């Protein structure tokens, strides 16, 4: 590979070799202007990865600026490895979500595993100890053998990495829709805890300070991974397996412990993960953020393959590597510290004052580029945006209630839809109890992890109903944030902030860019109303296969603060005789619903609507009632409507059922997906206090009959279902489809 002669600057220009690396003609002309000369092969490589959408957000920056990113608890917003939010008592929570979609489509096990590894490094590079992992996954329909393979391997990859490294995977979501068949989405989220004084930044301050490389050695895996993530998948993508990195969770476990010990040392100046674009992004970004330059000697890079060129070393995305800056003269302490963990720490450069990134190899300077040009000065594009053709058509459709003959059969069929069915097959492969801090395990509205040494907990969830967002990006964007907050509140937490993972098709298509703009508008409005700022995130574009885009899927990862663990609330019924309440009104809203998809095989019409002020009021009332000790169980009403929510609360309990009376047209009462609704149970003696605190309607009570019976307002039975049979259908659906 490396014995081939690299093309010279003139050949790069004349033969348009830069275009193969992902640069446009205009961008190459900009590079020429910045340097005042033609770039060589290595320099062209540096610009091509740093100016890719994946690293520069050149197509999405104008949209991302709409997000609210500040708040009284926000200690670090977007721009560093991960965002940080204050949780009181000198402690803070650090969290971020990232995508690993393209690699997972091609090499699902390693693609998913290294996605987990990368997001963990983003969190501990801030100085935090990772305490929990979540994920948000999208696949095609499980009837397809290829989808089964991708699903099984992605879950195995997440489990393999998370379990080995000893961080519990506590929650997440999995949804299935035909549009993800060729392009699955794998979004991984990591949550960590930190004391305020331990917060570190990825900045290279102090001229003369030493640049060191720590962790695993560099190979040829993942070269141009960032560029690969910035183009559409095609048949030829299979050939890009080398662009998928290979992870080693045991190496990463050692790296976490070594870095967390390093962070206690005053020798450390700055630290950054070598993620997308490897050594290039970590060095250029650390220099640029500090207003400094960096010189690096590439002969000193630990290499696990022979004859690597500067281009290959700079663009490799080998895993489990960090770049650190330490005070001059303190290098040996760092070497000794890492040696204790069996890890390499080598000096490979120094911080300079002139803002240049200079690379040397075999005694020659092989690249000289302004650090800011790579990190900050990528061109920004305001892409044309055009309302999707389908949108007006869907908006004009009048709301129709699907025809349902047999309510019980329909409920059982919904419980067996893979998007609604139990995800136990998934999370049983994850060790969600390791570190013994998990208070609420997977399967409820949000996971809860205790904050050791305090009475507090962290509630966390990932949410996004991409069908709603496809039908109406702005409304759907509001709903994604609101549903995440609703899940946090149902678990007894106060929503704090979000991280987002914006998964979309090709932004060069005006209709796709319109989806991006509108959904971000909706999310931003919801974040402002619910006071949950965006503290970081990730953009994943070009999620298309053969020109067909996935649904717009801006996933929301939210963390909330449980002020006292005695407030922790779960969705399952607690005891017979408790009263069942519903909060929120039900309308005949079926656009994008599970029922619509099940009956028609497609989605159409208007998405459910949401009033954010009403949402906020209800969330505040529910949280106050939970904190006052008035609530036995709480569950948000989502996919499948009230019938599914009530059934899930019964399935999670032991031997309990419920008798409930619902007003209005039966199909809507049972299965509509109207927003801002909760199913709450309350002890009989708390009835008066609860009704004073919360606007809710009592609809029935919890029974010990092991049956769910739902009546209409005339008291006619709409359905009676045995809870054991429902549980069997709900739990057995995914294993059955995988056989």
Curated annotation (Swiss-Prot):
Catalyzed reactions per annotation: N(2)-formyl-N(1)-(5-phospho-beta-D-ribosyl)glycinamide + L-glutamine + ATP + H2O = 2-formamido-N(1)-(5-O-phospho-beta-D-ribosyl)acetamidine + L-glutamate + ADP + phosphate + H(+)
Residue numbers annotated as active site: 54, 100 (proton acceptor)
Places the protein is found: Cytoplasm
One Pfam family hit: AIRS
Keywords annotated in UniProt: ATP-binding, Cytoplasm, Ligase, Magnesium, Metal-binding, Nucleotide-binding, Purine biosynthesis
Enzyme Commission number(s): 6.3.5.3
Subunit structure, interactors included: Monomer. Part of the FGAM synthase complex composed of 1 PurL, 1 PurQ and 2 PurS subunits.
Matches recorded under PANTHER family: PHOSPHORIBOSYLFORMYLGLYCINAMIDINE SYNTHASE SUBUNIT PURL (PTHR43555:SF1)
Name of the protein: Phosphoribosylformylglycinamidine synthase subunit PurL
UniProt organism field: Bacillus cereus (strain AH187)
């Amino acid at each position: 590979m490396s014995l081939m002669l690299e093309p010279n600057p003139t050949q790069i220009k004349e033969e348009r070799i830069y275009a193969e690396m992902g640069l446009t003609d205009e961008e190459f002309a900009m590079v020429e202007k910045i340097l005042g000369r033609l770039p060589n092969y290595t320099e062209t490589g540096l610009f091509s990865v740093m100016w890719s959408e994946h690293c520069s957000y050149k197509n999405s920056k104008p949209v991302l600026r709409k997000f609210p990113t500040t708040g009284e608890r926000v200690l670090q917003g977007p721009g560093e490895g991960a965002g940080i939010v204050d949780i009181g008592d000198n402690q803070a929570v650090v969290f971020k979500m990232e995508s690993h979609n393209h690699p997972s489509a091609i090499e699902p096990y390693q693609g998913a595993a290294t996605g987990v590894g990368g997001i963990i490094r983003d969190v501990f590079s801030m100085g935090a100890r990772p305490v929990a992992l979540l994920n948000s996954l999208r696949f095609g329909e499980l009837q397809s053998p290829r989808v089964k393979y991708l699903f099984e391997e992605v879950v195995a990859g997440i489990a393999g990495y998370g379990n080995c490294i000893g961080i519990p995977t506590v929650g997440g979501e999995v949804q299935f829709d035909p549009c993800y068949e060729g392009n699955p989405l794998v979004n991984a989220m990591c949550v960590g805890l930190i004391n305020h004084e331990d917060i570190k930044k990825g900045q290279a301050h102090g001229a003369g300070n030493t640049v060191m490389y720590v962790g695993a050695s560099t190979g040829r895996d993942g070269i141009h991974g960032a560029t690969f993530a910035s183009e559409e998948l095609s048949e030829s993508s299979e050939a890009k397996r080398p662009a998928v990195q290979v992870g080693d969770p045991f190496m990463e476990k050692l790296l976490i412990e070594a870095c967390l010990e390093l962070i206690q040392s005053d020798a450390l100046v700055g630290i950054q993960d070598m993620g997308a674009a490897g050594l290039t992004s970590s060095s250029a970004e650390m220099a640029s953020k500090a207003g400094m330059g960096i010189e690096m000697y590439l002969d000193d890079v630990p290499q696990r393959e022979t004859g690597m060129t500067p281009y290959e070393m700079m663009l490799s995305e080998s895993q489990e590597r960090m770049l650190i800056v330490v005070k001059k003269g303190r290098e040996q302490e760092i070497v000794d510290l890492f040696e204790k963990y069996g890890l390499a720490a080598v000096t490979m450069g120094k911080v300079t004052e002139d803002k240049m990134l200079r690379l040397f190899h075999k005694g020659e300077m092989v690249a000289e580029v302004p650090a800011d040009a790579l990190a900050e000065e990528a061109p920004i594009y305001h892409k044309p945006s055009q309302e999707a053709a389908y949108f007006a058509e869907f908006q004009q459709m009048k709301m129709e209630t699907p025809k349902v003959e047999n309510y019980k059969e329909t409920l059982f069929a919904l419980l067996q839809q893979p998007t609604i069915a139990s995800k136990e097959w998934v999370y049983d492969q994850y060790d969600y109890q390791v570190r013994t801090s998990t208070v609420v395990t997977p399967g409820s509205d949000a996971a809860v992890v205790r904050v050791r040494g305090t009475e507090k907990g962290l509630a966390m969830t990932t949410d996004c109903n991409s069908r709603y967002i496809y039908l109406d990006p702005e409304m759907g964007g509001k709903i994604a944030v609101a549903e995440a907050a609703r899940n946090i509140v149902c678990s007894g937490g106060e929503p704090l902030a979000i991280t987002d993972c914006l998964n979309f098709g090709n932004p060069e298509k005006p209709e796709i860019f319109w989806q991006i703009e509108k959904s971000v508008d909706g999310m931003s409005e919801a974040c402002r109303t619910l006071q949950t700022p965006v503290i970081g995130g990730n953009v994943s574009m070009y999620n298309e296969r053969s020109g067909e885009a996935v649904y717009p899927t801006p996933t929301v990862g939210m963390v909330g603060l449980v002020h006292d663990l005695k407030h922790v609330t779960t969705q399952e019924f607690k005891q017979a005789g408790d009263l069942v309440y519903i909060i929120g009104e039900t309308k005949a809203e079926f656009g994008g619903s599970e029922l619509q998809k099940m009956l028609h095989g497609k989605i159409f019409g208007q998405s459910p609507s949401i009033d954010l002020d009403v949402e906020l009021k209800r969330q505040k009332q529910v949280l106050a009632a939970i904190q006052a000790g008035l609530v036995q169980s709480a569950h948000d009403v989502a996919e499948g409507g009230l019938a599914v929510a009530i059934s899930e609360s019964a399935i999670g309990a032991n031997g309990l059922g419920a008798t409930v009376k619902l007003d209005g047209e039966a199909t809507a009462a049972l299965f509509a997906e109207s927003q801002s609704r909760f199913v709450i149970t309350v002890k009989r003696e708390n009835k008066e206090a609860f009704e004073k605190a919360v606007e809710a309607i009592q609809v029935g009570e919890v029974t010990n009959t092991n049956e769910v019976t739902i009546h209409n307002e005339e008291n006619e039975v709409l359905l009676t279902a045995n809870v054991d049979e429902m549980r069997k259908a709900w739990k057995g659906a995914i294993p059955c489809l995988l056989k």
